[in-house]
Swiss-Prot record:
GTPase that plays an essential role in the late steps of ribosome biogenesis. Keywords: GTP-binding, Nucleotide-binding, Repeat, Ribosome biogenesis. GTP 2 binds at residues 212-219, 259-263, 324-327. CDD domains: EngA1 (cd01894), EngA2 (cd01895). The lineage of its organism: Bacteria, Pseudomonadati, Pseudomonadota, Gammaproteobacteria, Vibrionales. GTP 1 binds at residues 9-16, 56-60, 118-121. HAMAP family: GTPase_Der. Disulfide bonds: none annotated. GO terms for molecular function: ATP hydrolysis activity; GTP binding; ribosome binding. Residues 380-464 form the KH-like domain. This is GTPase Der. Associates with the 50S ribosomal subunit.
Amino acid sequence: MVPVVALVGRPNVGKSTLFNRLTRTRDALVADFPGLTRDRKYGHAHFSEHDFIVIDTGGIDGTEEGVETKMAEQSLAAIDEADVVLFMVDGRAGLTPSDVAIAKHLRQLEKPSMLVVNKVDGIDPDAASADFWQLGVEDMYQIAAAHGRGVTALIDLALNPFAEALKAENGEVSDLTEFEDEEEEQVDFTEEEAEEEFKRLQDQPIKLAIIGRPNVGKSTLTNRILGEERVVVYDMPGTTRDSIYIPMQRDEREYVLIDTAGVRRRKNINETVEKFSVVKTLKAIEDANVVLLLIDARENISDQDLSLLGFALNAGRSIVIAVNKWDGLDNDVKDRVKKELDRRLGFVDFARIHFISALHGTGVGHLFESVQEAYKSATTRVGTSVLTRIMKMATDDHQPPMVRGRRVKLKYAHAGGYNPPIIVIHGNQVRNLPDSYKRFLMNYYRRSLEIMGTPIRIQFQNSENPFEAKTNKLTISQERKRKRMMSMVKGRK
């Protein structure tokens, strides 16, 4: 499973700075969708070949007695369900009553925690950290999140136990290297590795995660999909943050249904108050191929829904949206709901939207048509010649802009990975292309390849000049001739 790191601390200690550094996105097209809220509290982070989820739990401000009331309920749940807690304090401001209150609260949770003293750049780190020994910690870690100093070692220490556990579980050797430079760009797959990834995906069942806010009908939809008389035997022992994985078959296609709400007998569904778990939902998104977001038609789409969609986009997951409880609404309300969806979901205009009733089964069957379509789009093999031809057509329709007096030249394109589809474009100065032109290329590929239900990632590689590192080496006769010419030029002066 993907480890979860929670950032905890009072306001203005640098949690957002560290969050932004950890959740940086290589390709602006992945994160910078028009209309997508940027006020995210959780995100996907990369450490070498290791992925993890990072959660900014928000600032706590107040006295010890105010900890329970000042901290949001979801933040408490996120801390409780996280694998590691990074307790951040401000080295310049020193120890405060809020820091003491938070430390006491974390001790009660008995959660693996690391005290992180931030903002130690330009000052004596040991002197700035001295007061924090009063918190009774065994060790503390000094960083400057704004400049990235110390972040590599911190993340290495936090994730190393999980890398070892994963290595033992898979019987593989895990290579944890340094945290990659923020400006560095790399291609996820070579063409050969992309081909291997394609073959692997064809042999696997589709992992479908049903996510959404509490009481939107996730359990009802799950039971509808599995069948009315299905006896629930999937509540296997495990931690409360583990989702339930249910193998199933539909239309001669194998699936694994990832249920974040828990499958319950129908008679108990209405009696159970569902507890929403952010961590459980994020882990389900990470582990899925296709994400099905369920929305209640009787409620407005929330910022939380948009944040979940944004997380799914950044994770590269295919997306299908279902609006539940559609039956019984009058036409005026339906029109208003559709307009609101169009207004707020423009950044996922590639995703199919279905209007269903999970309770009565209306429209549920069509969901799997879109799930299969999205997965097929995410895993369809496209050759280098086709991708290059589409790229040439795009540049003929709209030339790349000039950069520093020279026009950007796109040479060729090839597949760089699947699920999501990754297109690698090689050329001169391609990394200097503006986001607007990158978005034009992405939309052009989507229309040309008829890709629906999945985000597209385009990565750019500057072609290397094979003669750039070479110097002209003159022969002896050439050296003599050059000297004679130089002396003649000087003589004329």
